[in-house]
Amino acid sequence: MKGQVMIEFIKTPIRKLLNLHLRWVCKREFRKQSFSRFNERPVELAFVFKHIARIYPRKVLDVGTGATALPHLMRNCGCLVTSIDNIEDYWPSEMVNRHYHVINDDITNSKLQDKFDLITCVSVLEHIEDSESAIRNMFTLLNTGGYLILTFPYTENKYCKNVYKLPGSSYGQNNPYITQSYSRNELSQWLEENNGIIIKQTYWQFWDGDFWTVGNQIIPPFEVGVEDKHQISCLLIQKK
């Protein structure tokens, strides 16, 4: 009993000190806010939570979390959430996520042994050069009948290896990673090889050019049809 009291006596000031640092970090981020540009997250996260509300998955895996709060928000929904990212190889300064615990795991060669009802991969796949291995591993980690939510740059009829290198690209030229824009060919191949079916696919126009980042940004973006100009797609896929 005395030992437990002593442990709590030591832990309390340490906890207060850690909380003080966290408050300082949050306040600093708040004060340093500056507007640069809008991004695609409102569209993508709306798609994610719309389908979580319909599926109500028990076990969820978020792939490529980075420093985002998505796993924390899904945990707030009651889901049991696992979060992974290739921290040591992809992030130059070993990223720290203060919202949720992120496991260091490369989805192209995942060491996870668990199975999941839903896997989310939001604006991540396009930065992975070996996309096929990433998709294959995500399907492997899904339960039969489970769901995969993918969002990425997409142009129905033409693939692009790196949109940042296209004439007229508005940003990204100095980024150390690529951003691919997928097409129906890549998507169909993934589904055929991994026994998946599309449950829902939406298309969005964010730019007046043909590919993501090309031309003038359109804010707010438009949800359009597959035959219309679009640069982003959100997909709900089921493993058969």
Please annotate each region the language model reported.
Residues 33-34, 55-56, 62, 171-173:
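A short, structure-level motif marking secondary-structure boundaries and short turns
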Residues 40, 63, 113, 226-229:
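Residue-level marker of regulatory loop/turn positions in helix-turn-helix DNA-binding domains and
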Residues 42, 68, 231:
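Membrane-embedded glycan transfer/ligation machinery
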Residues 12-19, 23-52:
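Class I SAM-dependent methyltransferase Rossmann-like catalytic core
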Residues 15, 35, 94, 108, ...:
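S-adenosyl-L-methionine-dependent methyltransferase catalytic module, highlighting the catalytic core
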